[in-house]
From Swiss-Prot:
EC number(s) from the headed UniProt entry: 6.5.1.1
Catalytic reaction list: ATP + (deoxyribonucleotide)n-3'-hydroxyl + 5'-phospho-(deoxyribonucleotide)m = (deoxyribonucleotide)n+m + AMP + diphosphate
Name of the protein this chain belongs to: Probable DNA ligase
InterPro entries linked to this entry: ATP-dep_DNA_ligase, DNA_ligase_ATP-dep, DNA_ligase_ATP-dep_C, DNA_ligase_ATP-dep_cent, DNA_ligase_ATP-dep_CS, DNA_ligase_ATP-dep_N, DNA_ligase_N_sf, NA-bd_OB-fold
Amino acid sequence: MPWDVKFSHGLYLPQLGWWLDAHFPQKRSFVSHAHSDHTATHDEILCSAGTAALMRARLDAKRIEHVLPFGQTEQLTADCGVTLHPAGHIFGSAQCLLEHGEHGSLLYTGDFKLRRGRSAEPCATPHAELVIMETTFGRPHYVFPPTAQVLNDIATFCHETIADDGVPVLFGYSLGKSQELLCSLEESQLPVMLHPQTHKLTRVYEQFGIAFPPYREFDLATVRGHVVICPPQSRESAFVRRIPGHRTAMITGWAMDPGAIYRYQCDAAFPLSDHADYQDLLRFVEAVNPQRVLTLHGFATEFAQTLRERGLEAWAIGEDNQLELGIRSSPPQVRAGDATPSSRSSGDAGVAAPACATPLHAPDSFARFVAAADAVKATPKKLEKIAVLRDYLAALTPPDMGTAATFLTGRAFPQRDPRNLTLGWSVIKRAVLEVAGVTEADYRDAYHRFADTGDAAGAVLAQRSLRPGDATPSSRPEILGVAGVADPGPAASRPAATSAPTTCSLADMALFFERAAAARGPAAKLDLLRERLALITPDEARYLIKIITGDLRIGLKEGLVEEALAAAAGQPLEAVREAAMLCGDIAAVARAARTDTLAEIQLTVFNPLQFMLASPEPTAEAIVDRFAAQRTAEAAAIVAGVGDPGPGSSSPATADAAPALARIWLEEKYDGIRCQLHKSGGRVELYSRDLNVITEQFPDLARAALALPHDFIGDGELLAWRDGRALPFAELQKRLGRKGGDDFFLGAEIPVSISFYDLLWLDGRSLLKEPLRERRALLERLLHGDATPSSRPDGDEGVAAPALQPATLNPQLSTKFSLAPVTFAHTASDIEAAFLAARQRGNEGLMAKDPASGYTPGRRGLAWLKLKKAYATLDVVVVGVEYGHGKRRDVLSDYTFAIRDEEHDNQLLTVGKAYSGLTDVEIAQLTQHFLEHTLEVHGRYRVVVPDTVIEVAFDTIQPSSRHQSGFALRFPRIARIRTDKTPAEIDTLATCRKLAAAAGSGGIAAVGARPPPAASD
């Protein structure tokens, strides 16, 4: 007969009548170690001598103690022997090996580590048939650096802080981690002071003969020159605040997580843990050589899955054990008391929830989507990602292929679809808490680990030991057999033998998103989300919420989805990419690719396409070098017979001609809103950068466009405009909030204009592949009332001549539409002069363009470059806020902001803090938003959902260890709120590196320096 294991706030062995690390007071319990989350005031305990002594120091209560030396076997019951083995976690930590004649051997590890610590007994690996093991760091991400390296880094941090006349403060648990640090700092010869609680427990260690290097109890008067070791919970206390010049460091395995420094609000974080990392978990299983494994704590589901993939029977205790893509094992049975999906109540006005009865392994199941997404995340290799998606997508029907492709881009709907879920963070959190039955503190802890709403929700939902309809966890523990599979309960409640696990389909999830978008008000949306979360597994919930928040964070760009679609459908990649650029609907592209109708996708009016983007360059010299290198490469390719300049190409016939083509087309970069204007017959629509319709906010522009005689799609900058020049962006923002009516005085109060610089479509003809010089010529004629085709305008070396720039426009349109002025440059000095002139006119900088380039929607290539050197700016996302001072003491006006690291899953890295630049009205609006989207509170500081993009100006950028990005901005100030941008569009770590390199070489030395005054007229 196998072991019976019940799980509810600890593990219970009914065949023995003993608990293992019970969380609440019980009659009898084994206590693996003395950390507070493993102890309680039990009547009778089994533990090691070290644990017993530490418990007496921490937990003053009467109890019966069975203290067992390591390696000594005694009878726990008449027919079961017990042996304690060192776990290596902290001093006295023990594993419990049970040996029963009928049930076999069971090893419970408690918390453990294989790494040999300096203040704990080394971990043993006794053989057992069944192992119940902790898997705190059960993901491949958690492979710790060599201990010697980490300790050296900690010592360096301490030495540097003391050298700067500061006091290094190291945060580690007062029991275990602090003693490890104390021993580890001996070689660095650093004097150490201990927090009073840490000091008390260290004295207990010494009673067992453990020797430490010299240390003192904390003394504020003599603290300078010392390292202070104290528990993590003191980091926000007056104890730390009163230490002069303190610099703090968190010592934890979670330092491996992105943003750990920010999450812990410390100056540094070092990955030293008393738990086994991923590799040691695998080594432990190999050494113990069990027949089956039950996992718990941390990433239990993921590690159990890893073991199954290696051929070992393994299941996560208290969590859903859904099978991943390609796993052939039998799934766990349904638990007793579980409601079937179709019987669960709906939160939507009493209407029954969708049945979600798709077989688990059906190609269109959402579980298969989740497995494919996890497989993509698991590999850093582009070709492997594409192969995973190719195989997944190839098995789907055209409609399902379209739905999956949309979800893979992190969206519920195609980009051009105007529907919005408006499922905010507070609704998501509330739904997760209600379904999981956990506290808000549990949710915060999960968010700390992942810094991702979806991953945090998945982890919290995985903690629920019972599904809705079961008895409460406290009244009916989950019963597990030796395989870790839940006992199905009485035969009457078991599903028929022919039944198979079911899940939601892709179509089910798409219908959910449609219902959520159509639902009115947060209450209705909450009901829908709660209903859906109750129907699906934690892993499925993880990706559901990732899609809701708009970012899968699996290392997948839309370009890779396009490559996978092409491979799955057997279509040319360029055809798929062109179709995606034209229609902005990846679902439509997927369906067309599968049905061989890609050629039918054409650029059409009122279907906005993504804007062509420019790559940033920090200096004029960099722009010249970039274009020169590009032209030389093109020329060399043609001479070698491997290149084709194509229609309108500026590539020379020989490589010798390349230097003559260094003439560069320049346009001024305005501080406005990127805008597409679509006009056909009597209809006009305006679209913003994020492809939203903004016609209602600018009806005067729409009316003016009706005067144009041709149908067209134009690309330009929408500006607040008066007396022939652009007004500050703040003036334009006053128009952005007004819609739903045609204010007669609006145009006079805040006049607006569009400065056009490109023409994409004219009278049914796509111009995307035409060279820029041709598109510009047609744009000029359009605004003059004549858009008939003409021969290519003459220009020096084939470059469009300045004559393309008209002196006057159609009088009816001159106040509403203009052509972006074009100038030309040969050298970096020319570009510098043009830049200063643009700055003098109050504009942001320059755009440098290749006049032979086509228009590539949504692509950030090298045909367009932007220079914003002086008064440089970065688009960043707010991750933390604080209350201000003085008149702003009651509003959140101080903002900590971050850029993204595109090379590491777009994790957010802080780069600075700013508190000036916004109006009182804007600050008041943002205060309300941030109060509603606060993740956690640390005194005056609030961690907020990273959903607000701002543009930050600064004087220069330089390397710095102060922020997670490794860079700091000099005199940052907020230029504007970027409501037109999402966090996925903020600037990157690579951009910071380029700007810092330019600053170091003098390229941004002029940043913050005013351009010279203009010559008087």
